[in-house]
UniProtKB/Swiss-Prot annotation:
Alphabetized GO MF terms: galactose-6-phosphate isomerase activity; ribose-5-phosphate isomerase activity
EC number(s) on file: 5.3.1.26
HAMAP family noted in UniProt: LacA
Organism: Staphylococcus epidermidis (strain ATCC 35984 / DSM 28319 / BCRC 17069 / CCUG 31568 / BM 3577 / RP62A)
GO biological process, one term: D-allose catabolic process
Catalytic activity, as annotated: aldehydo-D-galactose 6-phosphate = keto-D-tagatose 6-phosphate
Quaternary structure note: Heteromultimeric protein consisting of LacA and LacB.
Entry keywords, A to Z: Isomerase, Lactose metabolism
One Pfam family this sequence matches: LacAB_rpiB
Family statement drawn from the similarity comment of this UniProt entry: Belongs to the LacAB/RpiB family.
Domain of life (superkingdom): Bacteria
Protein name per the record: Galactose-6-phosphate isomerase subunit LacA
C-alpha cells in the first residue's frame, strides 16, 4: 500500500507533518505536490489520479478547510472520498464506504488530531458484505 498525499499552499505545513508521521511509522508515502504551489483543484486531481493507479493505494488531500478538495475528489469517476476531521469518521469511511481518499482542512484539524485521523484511515479495512450494496450504488452514479 502506498499513501498518496498532496496539498495546496494552505495545507502544505500539515501535509508535511502527516507525511513525516506516516513515514516514521513505516508507511510508503508518495507526495505528489512536493515543491509545488498548487491550487486545491490541481493538488487533489494529482492525488486522485495517483491513487487510481493501484487498488492498494490510498490518498490524503489537504487544503484550508477540506471542503474544496472533497468537492474535487468526488467529481473524479470511480473515486469515493470523505471529508473528515475526526478519527472515527476516518476509520469508518474506510470500513463501510471503501473510501480510497480523505480530505482534511489545515485550518480545522490540529496537528495531533491530523496524525490520528491519518492513522485511523490507513489502518482501516473495508468490511464489504452489506456495505458493498452502497459502494455499488455510488459507483453506478459515475
Amino acid at each position: 500500500m502506498t499513501i498518496i498525499i498532496g496539498s495546496d499552499v494552505d495545507g502544505k505545513r500539515l501535509k508535511e507533518l502527516i507525511k513525516d508521521y506516516l513515514e516514521d511509522n513505516d508507511y510508503d508515502v508518495l507526495d505528489v505536490t512536493e515543491g509545488k504551489d498548487l491550487d486545491f483543484v490541481d493538488s487533489t486531481v494529482s492525488v486522485a489520479k495517483e491513487v487510481q493507479k493501484s487498488d492498494d493505494n490510498l490518498g490524503i488531500a489537504i487544503d484550508a478547510y477540506g471542503a474544496g478538495s472533497f468537492i474535487v475528489a468526488t467529481k473524479i469517476k470511480g473515486m469515493i472520498a470523505a471529508e473528515v476531521s475526526d478519527e472515527r469518521s476516518a476509520y469508518m469511511t474506510r470500513s463501510h464506504n471503501n473510501a480510497r481518499m480523505i480530505t482534511m482542512g489545515a485550518e480545522i484539524v490540529g496537528d495531533t488530531l491530523a496524525k490520528n485521523v491519518a492513522k485511523e484511515f490507513v489502518n482501516g479495512h473495508y468490511d464489504g458484505g452489506r456495505h458493498q450494496i452502497r459502494v455499488d450504488m455510488l459507483n453506478k452514479m459515475c
